[in-house]
Amino acid sequence: MDTDLTGLRWFKSSASSAAGCVEIAHLPEGGVAVRDSKDRGKTPHVFNRHEWECFLIGAKSGEIDLPVT
């Protein structure tokens, strides 16, 4: 996906600390860009709307939870 990321409004969870976390930006075509707030110079990961919705469904249902060791 070749997406223009200039001028995007990035945000993170209000529950996150100042130490850094994941930031997302909504894309005009409906997807999202995801980046690490500690290394904003790296190219963000870009997901279309369907990919992002599938991720959210999986995260909310516990599908992608790591096992407790």
What are these regions (language model features)?
Residues M1-T69:
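Positively charged, low-complexity terminal tracts
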